[in-house]
């Protein structure tokens, strides 16, 4: 066997081994709304915004109904943020500050059972693209 064949075979074996190890290694942990992506204070401010601006068209509970959860579960959080920030409030779309939209979104997440965390929800579409909406099914009240 020539040295070239031996080295080529060893290289192929090494590449296959490395590919197998890389495939088995855990990747970066996915960030979801179940990871605590907003603060309790941020959600409280979002509730104030919701109750003063949004509730006239969207009664309390609108954003925690089964149809809402089914539509958004698994989607990037940036999609919901973009929808809110470009179309709401209905009479004056896109008139709130980005932080106000993020606060309102934090409130919506809280209402859907997502836990609060230590860092505020960012008001950036780019950052929110990294977060998936995870809304576990609500269990009916006894």
Residue ranges and their predicted role:
Residues 24-49, 92:
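Electrostatic cytochrome c docking/interface patches
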Residues 9-20:
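Bacterial N-terminal signal peptides
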Residues 96-142:
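Flexible coil segments in periplasmic/lumen-exposed cytochrome c-class electron-transfer proteins
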Residues 46, 50-60, 104, 108:
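The canonical Cys-X-X-Cys-His
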Residues 40-41, 67-82, 89-102, 120, ...:
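Electron-transfer interface patches adjacent to heme c in soluble/periplasmic c-type cytochromes
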Residues 63-64:
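Short, non-ligating residues that shape and space the ligands of small metal-coordination modules
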Residues 1-5:
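Positively charged n-region of N-terminal signal peptides that target proteins for export
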